[in-house]
């Protein structure tokens, strides 16, 4: 298999390249009876889209979803849902000079070694353009999770370079192009990115995602762990080089008396586990974080080799994000939502007759960040 499909009971397959005629996905396993219309995809797709601000790629795509199958008279039918988005703003000529060169830090070299051929236009299949369809598929998952279980999945930029939020408000996140939780810092972020763009360099970032309302019991032990599948899904996002669940790598310096999440009849007293213990949800907010590397497409010259093995200097033209993390929150939300829906369907299939167990400990403190 080509590993273009993920999920078990909810299986999502994506297809298409950055500069091809279209990108698309097939969602197999969505229960019937969910109301779904093409216009419902617009909000999240615009949140992910390039061209939202001067701090992202200038490529502007309409990202209009065509529902090809799986929906009849506004309701899902239980059959595969096929979605298609036409590419309309490709500029393939920008990549003519690097068609035979390997851009450092990109998948050019590894795709060439694996397949013996590659599509150099905008990165082809390895482009973040592919994540558009993950976000589209997650529109279905988010709606089903919210209606069926009251689950919400929200993400935000929690670090830009060395800059961290100095405050937090969910309401601030959707009111600025950075998905930043502290509105007072946005002007400083604007100035930082303006200077970075003028320098021709790029920078990394961190994104946090919080899923609230997840019932205790979702997930599986050992090989189907909820945190394991979340980590795999998030690592499948372009440019992600690290994933944390809850306290994550901070756990290495904690004592057991600090890290353990004490329980009372009124709820948990902390959430260092990030809402998952033993691969199974505790009922607390699920907290995951990803680290994204700096964009490797730079207009600054760098050393590389071409397909003949000769040393060359590469300068990448085209339209690129100076920080891919700025558009990553909707993508990270999407992967979390798709994993949660798949796990919910699997839990219902195996354990639907178990019922609600007692005691069911309230989520308690419901910490936003595991470190708070």
Swiss-Prot record:
It catalyses: 5-O-(1-carboxyvinyl)-3-phosphoshikimate = chorismate + phosphate. Its EC number is 4.2.3.5. GO terms for cellular component: cytosol. FMN binds at residues 125-127, 238-239, 278, 293-297, 319. NADP(+) binds at residues 48, 54. Pathway: Metabolic intermediate biosynthesis; chorismate biosynthesis; chorismate from D-erythrose 4-phosphate and phosphoenolpyruvate: step 7/7. One of its GO terms (biological process) is amino acid biosynthetic process. Reduced FMN (FMNH(2)). GO terms for molecular function: chorismate synthase activity; FMN binding. Keywords: Amino-acid biosynthesis, Aromatic amino acid biosynthesis, FAD, Flavoprotein, FMN, Lyase, NADP. Its cofactor is FMNH2. This reaction introduces a second double bond into the aromatic ring system. Homotetramer. PANTHER family: CHORISMATE SYNTHASE. This is Chorismate synthase. It comes from Xylella fastidiosa (strain Temecula1 / ATCC 700964). The lineage of its organism: Bacteria, Pseudomonadati, Pseudomonadota, Gammaproteobacteria, Lysobacterales.
């Amino acid at each position: 298999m080509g590993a273009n499909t993920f999920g078990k009971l909810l299986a999502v397959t994506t297809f298409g390249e950055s500069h091809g005629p279209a990108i698309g996905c097939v969602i197999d396993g969505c229960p019937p009876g969910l109301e779904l219309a093409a216009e419902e995809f617009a909000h999240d797709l615009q949140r992910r889209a390039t061209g939202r601000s001067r701090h992202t790629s200038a490529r502007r795509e309409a990202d209009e979803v065509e529902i090809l199958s799986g929906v009849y008279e506004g309701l899902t039918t239980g059959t595969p849902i096929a979605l298609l988005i036409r590419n309309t703003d490709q500029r393939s000529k920008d990549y003519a000079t690097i068609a035979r060169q390997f851009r450092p830090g990109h998948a050019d070299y590894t795709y060439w070694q694996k397949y013996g051929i590659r599509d150099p236009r905008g990165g082809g299949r390895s482009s973040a353009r592919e994540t558009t369809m993950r976000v589209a598929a997650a529109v279905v998952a988010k709606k089903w999770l919210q209606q069926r279980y009251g689950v919400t999945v929200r993400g935000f930029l929690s670090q830009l370079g060395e800059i961290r939020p100095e405050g937090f408000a969910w309401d601030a996140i959707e009111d600025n192009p950075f998905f930043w939780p502290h509105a007072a810092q946005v002007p400083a972020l604007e100035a930082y990115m303006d200077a970075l763009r003028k320098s021709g360099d790029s920078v990394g970032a961190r994104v946090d995602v919080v899923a609230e309302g997840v019932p205790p019991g979702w997930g599986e032990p050992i090989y189907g762990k909820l945190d394991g599948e979340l980590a795999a899904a998030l690592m499948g996002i372009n440019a992600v080089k690290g994933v944390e669940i809850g306290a994550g790598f901070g756990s290495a310096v904690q004592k057991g008396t600090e890290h353990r999440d004490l329980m009372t009849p009124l709820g948990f007293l902390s959430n260092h586990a990030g809402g998952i213990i033993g691969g199974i949800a505790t009922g607390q907010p699920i907290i995951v974080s990803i680290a994204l590397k700096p964009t490797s497409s730079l207009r600054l010259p760098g050393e590389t080799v071409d397909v003949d093995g000769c040393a060359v200097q590469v300068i990448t033209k085209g339209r690129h994000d100076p920080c891919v993390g700025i558009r990553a929150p909707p993508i990270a939300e999407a992967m979390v939502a798709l994993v949660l829906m798949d796990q919910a369907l699997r839990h219902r299939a195996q354990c639907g007759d178990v019922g609600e167990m007692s005691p069911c400990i309230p989520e308690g403190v419901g910490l936003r960040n595991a470190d708070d």
